[in-house]
Amino acid sequence: VAMALQAHDGYSFRFWRDARTDPRLRGPAREVLDRVGLGARAGVPAANLAHGEQRQLELAVALATGPSLLLLDEPMAGMGPEDSVRMVELLGTLKGKVTILWVEHDMDAVFALADRVTVLVYGKAIATGAPEEIRADPHVLQAYLGEEA
C-alpha cells in the first residue's frame, strides 16, 4: 500500500529506502488499511494473509492511488460466505465515491451492490437494467434457471 501511495503522490523511489518505513507514507498507508479492515494486520506479509484478506489488500492498493474508477474482475471469487459478506460491505462503503465496473458471478453480491446490471450469455448481452428488472427478466430466467417466461 505504501508503494502505491508513493507512486500516486509523486515521491521518488529510492532503492535503499523501504517505502514501509517512510514517515510520509506510514500514516496514509495505515488509513487505507484501516478503511479496508486490515489495520490490525498491517505488519503481516501479504503471503501470510488469508485469501479474503489478500483480496482486501488488493483493493487497498487500488484505493491508495485515489481512483475515480475501479475495474474489478470477480472480487468474490474463491471466497467463503463470511469473506464475501465482508467484501460486499467494503464495496458498499465505496458507493457514490468511486465508480465501480465489475464482472461477478456471485449474484447475491451483484444484487446487493449494483445500480445497473448487464447479463451476458456466451459473451452476448441479453439484458440490462436495475437489479429488480434483471431478477424478473424472462430472458435471464430462461438462460440461467431454465424457466419458461
What are these regions (language model features)?
Residues V1-A149:
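Glycine-rich phosphate-binding loops of nucleotide-dependent enzymes
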